[in-house]
Amino acid sequence: MSFLSNFFKKENKDFNMSQPSELETYFQQFRKNIVGIGHTFQSPFGEKEIIYTDWTASGRFYRPIEEKILNEFGPFIANTHTETSITGSAMTMAYHKARNIIKQHVNASKDDVLIADGAGMTGVVNKFQRILGLKVSENLKNHTTVPDELRPIVFISHMEHHSNQTSWLETIANVEIIPCQDSGLICFDSFEKLLIKYKDRPIKIASVTACSNVTGIRTNYYKMAKIIHQHGGLCFVDFACSAPYVHIDMHPKDEESYLDAIFFSPHKFLGGPGSSGVLVFNKKLYKNLIPDNPGGGTVNYTNPWGDHDYVDDIETREDGGTPGFLQTIKTALSIQLKEKMGVENIIEREHEINKIVFEKLTKIPNLNILAAQHTDRLGIFSFYIKNVHFNLIVKLLNDRFGVQTRGGCSCAGTYGHFLLHVDQQTSKGIEKKILEGCMVERPGWIRMSIHPTITNNEVLYVCESIKQVAENYEEWAKDYTYNSIKNEYIHNTANPIEIELVNKWFESNNQ
């Protein structure tokens, strides 16, 4: 804590190291094993401790998980698809056990199948769309005609990540954004009107986020599931943002509120980086004779004359080639860690932290928190400083304070239009300039996202850092030059340490 205490002493701030709450103390047993805690780097303004507040983008390595994979799983690493040798058999069993742990965690039924693929939710939602037969090759689009009355209709919220919006726009489906209330929440009356409007469509899908990755606002996806099921539709839920922190239950007590499919990104879990995306869906949705990735492990028999028979089991059929068994094992281990921390503890601790953040940031005169009226949220705060480029703020927080945040639209550009009140004419003007190579007017914000393992003193430090940047950005900006091509701010004299750092990482990889 020396970096933090020295900072406040230097700035003559009244900073008493607070006594940790019971929950803060509870989470310290997990905090001490996070790789990177206390790590420093050399900034243009001296040595800084990394204060990580970018959890919505990625989780962090957890040392016991990395050591377990290395020391316990490692000696038995081998390809799966065999139960004869000890190594192959052990890995095959470990892979299947990991899959079962994931299924149990989301309360999947015997009729639900699991597919792990890609690097996160983006990979599995695109795979799911192909499995559903909703994707047509770009080269064939001009030769494919689907009458409007036969096109699936997909309903999304205004809060979606690009992966749960643009991916649907590239299918044969029509996509409708469900209108929101003045409060910024989904309007269910409007949703029901849309369902009536499209009542004759053969396939009706609601694909919605469980939680905004911009504001931390959670959606009532069970209510949405119940409504669309009553209209003969399907409900898919994107848990990419919230999966590390909340209960996931595909089959709640209200039978009409079941979820037909879910997807999430385990790399966002503590301990999860390096894992695959996860998709779980009801097998009734699978109508395919040919797997999405035909290959090793998907066939029962082939011969030289072109005959081939695919396996019947859906999970095996859609797991072509060598599966990502280590990625799936890591997902299971990070889920077990989440369960050990306890969802109730996680949520309650985040409420403690959120209270501090709101109290401190709302006092900064030139700072605006997006959707600030919604205080019941996960620990995600997106904000902007009036008339200041978001990436300048991110850079100053990094260089002067070591605070890791993220600037931009958080891959939620459509939601940004709602939050920043960007009308269509203004949007078109911005788009035109972006296409011409001018990025400076691209809308965005600064996002900080916390984890229950962060300490109160770190939270106070982050908030004080933001306050100082908001007060001093004009003077501090003189140290930087704006790069319009990269839309980034570059320090005028200091060499980027990242180049030397990364080159050093790869120098001794074989030693």
Model-flagged regions — what are they?
Residues 2-511:
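Pyridoxal 5′-phosphate
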